[in-house]
Each structure stands twice: as C-alpha cells, then as structure tokens.
C-alpha cells in the first residue's frame, strides 16, 4: 500500500476516479449505477420485456452477461482469430424468460455485440463506462461466492477446503481492474499466484523473452496487491521475499500456502461492496430516481434502501424453497458469503442458514432444464437493519496482529466476539519453519499463538435502523458467545461446484 496520500477509497477505485471528496464520490458512483439502470431499461424495451419479465433476476443476469461479453476485448479478439464451430464472434446472447399462457418459456436471443456496445454507451453519456462493467462483474462474483464453495479449486492448488473464507472474488475475470482487486480475498490472490508459478515450473519460456517480461510485471503487481491486503509486518515481509524471488518455484508456493493459512487468524483487509443486479437499478431509474443528483454509496445505507423497495422475482425449480433462494440472493447483494451468520441474521432480521441446509441450487437455469414445472416467486431482499461494509478483516487490536475470525471474512462493521478453535488452525503450522523465511514464519506463528479468542472485533460498532441514514444511533447486538456461524461450515456442506 502506498502512503495514505495515494490511498483511494473503494468508490474511487470503482469509478476509476482520482482523489475526490465525499460528495464527488457519491455523485460518480451514482452516475455509474444510474448508467447501468438506463442501459437495463433500454434493453427491456429492445427485447419487449413486460414489467414482470424485466424484474426477473434470470433475465437481468442474461442482459448483464451480454454487455460484459460485448466489452470483453481480449476474448473477442481471441474468438476472431480462432473461429470455432457455431460461435459467431460478433454476436452475444443468452436465455430470456417470458411469461406465456401462465407458463415461463425460455427464448434464446442473439444480438450484435456492436449494437449492445452502442446501447451501453448511449446509457452512459457516450462513454465506455468501464466502472459500471466492473460493478456488474463484482455482482456476479458475489453471487458465485454465495452459491459455490470452491473446494475443488482449493485442493487443486494444494490448499485446504477450510480456507474457503479466503476465496472471495475467485471467479472475477482478470480484467476487473482496481475495484476487482480490492474485493479479492487472500486465498484468491494466493491461488492466482500459485497457478502462475506452476506454469513457470512447467514451461521454461514462461518468464523469458518479451512476453516473460510482461509476465514478470504481472507477477510482481499481483504480489504487491496481496502484500497490501496483509496487515502485519511479517506477512508483508514474506510477500516481499516471494515477489523478489529470481525464479519463483516450489519454495514460493510453500510460502504462499503458509501465508494463506496464517490469514485464517491474522485476517487480511478485503473490501466488501453491495453490488445489485442491473434490474434493481433499472427499476429505480424507471421510477424517476436520479442517482447522480442524489448520490450513492456501495458501502452505506443506499443499497439497503434500494432493496427495501424493489420487487425482484426469480424462477424457482419444483423442489426449491423460495425463502432459501431469497437468502442466497440477499447474501450475494451484500457480499456476505463469508460473513458470520449471527451477524447476517441480525441485520436481515430473519435467520440466515448455512449453505448445506439450503434447498436451492444456483440462480441461473441450465439450457437443458425443463421449463414446464418452473414457477416464479418474489425474492425477499429486505433487511431489518443496515450496517456499514468493512474492509478491515476484523482484527481486534491496534497493532493489527490479533485474531480475526476463523472461516469468516467480516462484511459488516458490527461488533462480535471471535469464537475460534485455535488448536485446529495451529495444527496446520507444525514443523517447517526453516529456510529463508524462517524468522518471519516464527514471528507469524508467535502472533497467531498470542491471538485471544475472547477478544471482540469492531468494538462498539453496531447496526442502524433504516430510518437512521446518518448512522447516528448504533445498536450493538449481543451474540451467543459459544458458536461462530460460518456459512459453509455450519453443516456438512455438499459440493456444489459443477
């Protein structure tokens, strides 16, 4: 992290802006989501979607994916150079669901990418509005985080499924920029780096020549992003070692896995933003709301307020529970896949249950699924309270070298105790402290051993009533001290990763 003077808030990253004051940030974030809303309305008009169809989250996702695909320059270039059977590189599309004779029918649509780009630019005052595109990517990433536990991906890179709370943003595309980097978890960054190092081990030319130089720059940049997420000097020093390695190999992979494990207790700082589906912004714009004039923030009350009065529908398969589908989407909207379920339940005002107890599959419907039995229901996305999103990781004391929550990466800045089984985690650290990073490893292990489970994170921070938009009256919840609520581990979570 550079000095404080060059630190940008997430909203600045999100909107690509340089340093701005709070009002300017609110206005530029407002401009961004307003553009998404205008684009969505225009697409609904083009596709002749009824009001009900336009509020269907599956239609929203198809439209979002079309615009992301239309602006994916790298892939577009690749498709043009490697023409594959049955793929027109100039077109994009997907399933649109319409209501016909009391049934939902799927219609596959195709559009020229050029046309989609034109509509998007027109909705965004003629600009490319990459910030808005990144915003949609983060919404899709948050939805994936809530839907799938990345067990297989973790095991493939030699990490442990228990580290899944470090995997936020693991499905974000490479092109998601600074705003994307801000929301990536420690595990996601470690995994990207390990994949890169493995390629280097298997392919002698990976680090060589002109391409190799670019690869090296990318490697060092990723190392710096990861370093900036760590909050203790020893973890950062270890990242310097990994970055400066002449020829990254197994030693670096070992170091990275060690660091990822250490992040279960010495949490990294990972940003959280409430990114909503395009149809929600569309509904607000259609009702005459002027986002740019009113201003908008992704980390305050605004997304809660927007969801309080938006009616969004979802298709529901025959044996799915609509309340569970709602929970999945609510978690995605608030980037709360790795939040403590006790905190989420308190804010939402209804019990949030672990993944393995949800009777629902993902939101999207595969093209081979039979539509006959598919119904739709209203998603319940409202909340009882609102809370400020955090990026701190929830370490307790000022030296920042204290306990975060195991298997939880906090989303909301709300006081909670940190119940955790230190023994389980520390067992992973037996043995190997030799090699060039030995002193740092020893220091990191010492800090972890000194972490006290009885500490409280976010001391004095609370939730707020939805009428309290200036956040003047924090309500500090008290939680049952004994059990920490992890979404993926409150049960025997099934493997949903297909």
Swiss-Prot record:
Motif (Unconventional nuclear localization signal): 1-18
Intrachain disulfide bonds: none
Transmembrane annotation, as ranges: none
UniProt-listed GO biological process terms: symbiont entry into host cell; viral penetration into host nucleus
Listed Pfam families: Flu_NP
Sequence motif Bipartite nuclear localization signal, residues: 198-216
Assembly information from the UniProt record: Homomultimerizes to form the nucleocapsid. May bind host exportin-1/XPO1. Binds to viral genomic RNA. Protein-RNA contacts are mediated by a combination of electrostatic interactions between positively charged residues and the phosphate backbone and planar interactions between aromatic side chains and bases.
Protein name (database record): Nucleoprotein
Gene name of the encoded protein: NP
């Amino acid at each position: 992290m550079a000095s404080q003077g060059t630190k940008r808030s997430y909203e600045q990253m999100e909107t690509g802006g340089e340093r701005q004051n709070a009002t300017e940030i609110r206005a530029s974030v407002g401009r961004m989501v307003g553009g998404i809303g205008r684009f969505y309305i225009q697409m609904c008009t083009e596709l002749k979607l009824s009001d009900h169809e336009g509020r269907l989250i599956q239609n929203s996702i198809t439209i979002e994916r079309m615009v992301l695909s239309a602006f994916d320059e790298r892939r577009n270039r690749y498709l043009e150079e490697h023409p594959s059977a049955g793929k027109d590189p100039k077109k994009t599309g997907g399933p649109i669901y319409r209501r016909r004779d009391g049934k939902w029918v799927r219609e596959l649509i195709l559009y020229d990418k050029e046309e989609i780009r034109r509509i998007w630019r027109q909705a965004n005052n003629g600009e490319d509005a990459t910030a808005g595109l990144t915003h949609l990517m983060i919404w899709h990433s948050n939805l994936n985080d809530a839907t799938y536990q990345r067990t297989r991906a973790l095991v493939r890179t030699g990490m442990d499924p228990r580290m899944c709370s470090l995997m936020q943003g693991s499905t974000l595309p490479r092109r998601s920029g600074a705003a994307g980097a801000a929301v990536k978890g420690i595990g996601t960054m470690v995994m990207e780096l390990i994949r890169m190092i493995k390629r280097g081990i298997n392919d002698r030319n990976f680090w060589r020549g002109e391409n190799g130089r670019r690869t090296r720059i990318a490697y060092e940049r990723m190392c710096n992003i990861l370093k900036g997420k760590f909050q203790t000097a020893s973890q950062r020093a270890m990242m310097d070692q990994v970055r400066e390695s002449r020829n990254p190999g197994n030693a670096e992979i070992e170091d990275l896995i060690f660091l990822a494990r250490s992040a279960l207790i010495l949490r990294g700082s990972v940003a959280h933003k409430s990114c909503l589906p395009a149809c929600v912004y569309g509904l607000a714009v259609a009702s005459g709301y002027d986002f740019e004039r009113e201003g908008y923030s992704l980390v305050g009350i605004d997304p809660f307020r927007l969801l309080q009065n938006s009616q969004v529908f979802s298709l529901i398969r025959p044996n799915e529970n609509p309340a569970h589908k709602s929970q999945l989407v609510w978690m995605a909207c608030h980037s709360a896949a790795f939040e403590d379920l006790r905190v989420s339940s308190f804010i939402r005002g209804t019990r949030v249950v672990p993944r393995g107890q949800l009777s629902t599959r993902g939101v999207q419907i595969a093209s081979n699924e039979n539509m006959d039995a598919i119904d739709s229901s209203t998603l319940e996305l409202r909340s009882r309270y609102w809370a400020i999103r955090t990026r701190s990781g929830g370490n307790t004391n000022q030296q920042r070298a204290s306990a975060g929550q195991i298997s939880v990466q906090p989303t909301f800045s709300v006081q909670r105790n940190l119940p955790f089984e230190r023994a389980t985690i520390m067992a992973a650290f037996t043995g190997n402290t030799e090699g060039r990073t030995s002193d740092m490893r020893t220091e990191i292990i010492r800090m972890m051993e000194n972490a006290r489970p009885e500490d409280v994170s976010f001391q004095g921070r609370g939730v707020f009533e939805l009428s309290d938009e200036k956040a003047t009256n924090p309500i500090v919840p008290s939680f049952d001290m004994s059990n920490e609520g992890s979404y993926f581990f409150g049960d025997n979570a099934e493997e949903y990763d297909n």
